Regions:
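Active-site recognition of the HExxH zinc-binding catalytic motif
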Residues: 153-166, 185-189
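Auxiliary, metal-adjacent structural segments of Zn-dependent hydrolase domains
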Residues: 25, 63-133
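Short pre-active-site segment immediately N-terminal to the catalytic Zn-binding motif
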Residues: 134-155, 170-180
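N-terminal low-structure segments adjacent to metalloprotease catalytic domains
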Residues: 2-11, 19-54, 281-282
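Surface-exposed patches in mature extracellular/periplasmic domains of secreted proteins
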Residues: 89-109, 170-179, 200-206, 231-239
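Post-HExxH zinc-binding segment in Zn-dependent metallohydrolases
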Residues: 174-217
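Glycine-rich, acidic and aromatic/proline-enriched surface loops and short helix-turn segments
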Residues: 165, 189-197, 226, 230
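Pan-zinc metallopeptidase signature
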Residues: 217-282
Length: 282
C-alpha cells in the first residue's frame, strides 16, 4: 500500500474512531455501533471476564501498514478482546457459573502471515495469531468498517475455540472420527453467525452437508436456534459433557428431545431455506 495513501486513510480512520462510530465493546449481539473504548462493566460482565485471566498482546510487525491500521481502529486490544470473549461465552453458555474452560493466558499475536488467523495451544494456555497482511487487505479501499467487522468476526471464531467444550469419547480433533472436527469448527462459525459476525444470507453456503463443518453447520445451528430453540447452540455445546460417547444424533436428541435426529433436522433446514425441494429425499 502506498505510504502517502496509507497516511491519508489512517487519518480518516482516526477521525472516524473519534466520532464514536466503532462498535461498542459492551454490546450484545445485534447491538448498533457505538464506542469501542468506553464501556461500563456490569457484575455479570466481570463474572464472564473471570474465565479469561491474562492477555498478552504481541505485535510482531509494528511497522507494517496492517499494524498501523489495526491500532488506529482498535487502540485498546485488551479491552476489545475481552469484550468479544464475553460475546462468545454468552453465546455458548447459559451462565458464567457454567463449566467454562479457563483461559489462564491468551497470547494474541499480530503478525505478517499468508493465513488469516488460527488458534493454538490448550490446557488454559492459548495463542491466536491474526494477520496484519489481512488487515491491510481489508482496508484496501479505506474501509474502516470492513476491517472492524472482519476483525471481530474472525476473533469470534477463534475465541470460540478457546472456550467451547469438545466432544468426549470419540477421539481427538484430527482423528479418524470426523464428527469432532465438524462440531468444533461448526460451533465456532455458529457463534460467529449468532453474534452477527457474517454478512447474513450472502455468506451462507448453499446446499452441502453438515459434514462440511464451518459455515454449513454455523448457519444450520443458527437456523435451529431462531426457529426451534433459542438455547440450541448452548445445548449443543453442553452435549459435549452430557452425551458420552458423543454423536450427532445423541447431541440433537439431548438438545431438542427424543425423536429428533441430525439428518431429518438438516433436511428440514435445507427445505426451509430453499436449498432443496420439500419432496427431496433426506
Amino acid at each position: 500500500m502506498n505510504s502517502k495513501r496509507t497516511f491519508i486513510l489512517l487519518t480518516v480512520a482516526l477521525l472516524w474512531i473519534g466520532s464514536g462510530s466503532a462498535m461498542a465493546l459492551g454490546n450484545r449481539p445485534g447491538d448498533q455501533p457505538g464506542n469501542r473504548t468506553q464501556v461500563r462493566l456490569t457484575r455479570k460482565d466481570r463474572l464472564w471476564d473471570s474465565h479469561l485471566l491474562k492477555i498478552n498482546f504481541i505485535d510482531k510487525s509494528p511497522e507494517s501498514a496492517g499494524s498501523k491500521i489495526y491500532h488506529a481502529i482498535i487502540p485498546d486490544p485488551d479491552t476489545y478482546i475481552r469484550s468479544v470473549a464475553r460475546e462468545v461465552m454468552r453465546t455458548l453458555y447459559f451462565s458464567p457459573h457454567d463449566s467454562i474452560p479457563e483461559c489462564k493466558v491468551l497470547d494474541y499475536i499480530l503478525r505478517s502471515d499468508k493465513g488469516i488467523s488460527a488458534k493454538g495451544g490448550g490446557n488454559g494456555f492459548v495463542n491466536i495469531f491474526y494477520s496484519s497482511d489481512w488487515v491491510a487487505k481489508s482496508f484496501s479501499n479505506g474501509d474502516t468498517a470492513r476491517v472492524d467487522f472482519e476483525t471481530r468476526g474472525v476473533l469470534l471464531h477463534e475465541l470460540t475455540h478457546a472456550f467451547q467444550l469438545e466432544p468426549q469419547g470419540i477421539g481427538p480433533y484430527g482423528g479418524p472420527n470426523k464428527a469432532v472436527w465438524e462440531l468444533i469448527e461448526g460451533m465456532a462459525d455458529a457463534v460467529r453467525v449468532a453474534a452477527g459476525g457474517f454478512h447474513g444470507e450472502q455468506d451462507r453456503p448453499k446446499g452441502g452437508s453438515y459434514h462440511d463443518g464451518y459455515r454449513y453447520i454455523g448457519y444450520f445451528f443458527d437456523w435451529v436456534r431462531r426457529n426451534k430453540d433459542k438455547n440450541f447452540i448452548r445445548k449443543m455445546n453442553k452435549s459435549c459433557l452430557e452425551v458420552v460417547p458423543w454423536s450427532w444424533n445423541g447431541a440433537v436428541a439431548y438438545a431438542l428431545g427424543p425423536g429428533h435426529d441430525i439428518d431429518a433436522l438438516w433436511h428440514e433446514y435445507q427445505v426451509a431455506v430453499g436449498d432443496i425441494k420439500a419432496d427431496a429425499r433426506p
